[in-house]
Swiss-Prot record:
Pfam family, one: PPR_2
Sequence similarity: Belongs to the PPR family. P subfamily.
Keywords: Repeat
Protein's organism: Arabidopsis thaliana (Mouse-ear cress)
Keyword match Oxidoreductase: no
PPR repeat residue numbers: 138-172, 173-207, 209-243, 245-279, 280-314, 315-349, 350-384, 385-419
Protein name: Pentatricopeptide repeat-containing protein At2g28050
Single Gene Ontology BP annotation: mitochondrial mRNA 5'-end processing
Amino acid sequence: MTPQCFLKTLKTAKQTYTFSIYKLLLNSSSINQTLASPETPLSDLNLSTLRRILSDPDIKSWKCISLFNFILENPSLFSFQPDLRTHLSLTFRVLSERRFSYAKELLKPVAIDDILRYPFNVIVSSVIDECGCEKKVVGRFFNSMIMVYSDNGKFSEVVEVFEYMKNNEVKIDEKTCTLHLLNLKRCDQMELARDFFSLMVESGIDVVTVYSLTVVVTVLCCNGEITRARELVEEMGLVKGVKANIVTFKSMIGCCVKRWDFEELDLVLKLMEKESVMLDLDSYKVLIDGFTSYGKVEEAERLVLMMHDKKLRVESYLYNLIMNGYSRFGLVEKVIELYSEMSSRGVTPNKDTYWVLMNGLCKAGKVCEAMSFLNELRVNEFEIDEEMYSTLSEECYRVGMIDKSLEVVAEMIRDGFIPGATICERLADSLFEVNRKEAQMLITIVVKCGIKPKSCSQYGLK
């Protein structure tokens, strides 16, 4: 602003509203504190004066907002209340400065407040009557209206605003539409989300993006409509030129895997290949988890090999999933083979890896091999938990390795775990038969667990 214009504006300000208020707003650093002081000339303020203040370019917009909020929060101090026109005037001012969060806060009372709210058609009429703003600011206003309605659950009003903007050629922001879809999804309004997306598509306006498509695909998948989601992805690619990305496909992959719908999964993966969308690290993890949980262990192993070929980081837990899958089928040789491959490819085994190995070997009756991995656990300084100890002691006993079972129980006790009463009683029975002194120790442990074993009466113990 030139010095001449500034002096002219200042002169006008002096003439149109009380100079004390004007000076207050120009110089004060804290509007609320100043207005609350007894010296403040609040009686000089009326609705007409307020409107001129709020539109004055010499007064910072943040000061206008503070003054406006002070009036709303302290109605008893004023003989008037800001009307719709005043709300809109300040809203358009902050929107012209791209202060969107302030604009939404200013719109809340007139859009959703139980007492102050106005119907949308009344707000539109006021905008038409009062607005002299440029087209892009008007667009910001209506997009802000959509978000205020959406954030506060007024979903039918969102459609009303959308229709108005479409019919009056007001630019609809694609981000606004996506955020509204996310709000609908968050509120579990799946049907409304589908309907709104259809409205976006049918409007003929370029507002459908990969982001809004992904939200709707996720909504459809949450409802179990995987086929519809896949068909929508194909349709949007052909009709709108909107290509799905890996995030879109991950929603469908995750849904197929959770439902063990491998027929549909195959179609989704083929569509990915057709669209030249590559699986990422997370997609591989989801697929491997799904295949192993269903029992498609070989497919899961094939995916791990693909990950290695593509130089993707393969974590030990992925090998653990596959090894555990083979273990469930009793294919302990495959478990050992995978463990060897894991080491050769530089993937460091963790505690769970050893647990899968030991558990699988025990189930196959290969207890000695399982015990060797227990020693490897100690060498690698992994913590041995109670379940590992219990399994090994029971399996050693089952195959007749009484001394080994006793050794595991003793180590278990040294590590602060209490052995199960059943294994202690079984070991005690076996040791009593050969008059081993360790039997008494085991019976004592059982009794301390609150169980009276048969061995007590059988061998004359009380």
